[in-house]
């Protein structure tokens, strides 16, 4: 059996805490009371997923995720809540997402034994900005933009494998979203589920149940590093 040589990481939700980041940015931009920002952020994220699902259903290929988030924000905000400039500024916060506390130390340990790369639906420019700002020590950055399709389309996983020069069995997908892992597993990739109970904030509906269908189930990146011998 081939030995895993590279790890691919989902970024939004798995490596970064978008919920807290966006809520804090929204309150900074609009300190006035009366807006339930946690609810807005949850519906905003759901609107993003709905837009990607619609794009896949209509075979529209890749769309700028920044533009998708910007449009989805207008859909969830009432008229008069934030100016156009403020909405533009808040959308840019998706490029300033903070990592979960375990991420940098966990990646640092994993990097001693594996090639580390992103495999994200977000734009390449956003990945670069997030990673540089947060000090995320990737060896490579792969994104849907490079494949022209969004996860879970098989083409995006194959694209990453081609760029890495590795067989699927030599690569492990790491994500907190099970649809992502199942798509990778169907192509022969290894899988590691990382539970993020606060992905949608306290009381959010994150799926954190471990499953035997995945090769590894971990509580965070440090636990993942421990289980992978780093």
Question: What is each stretch, according to the model?
Answer:
Residues 21-28, 43, 71-75, 89, ...:
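Alpha-helical elements of Rossmann-like donor-binding domains used by nucleotide-donor carbohydrate transfer enzymes
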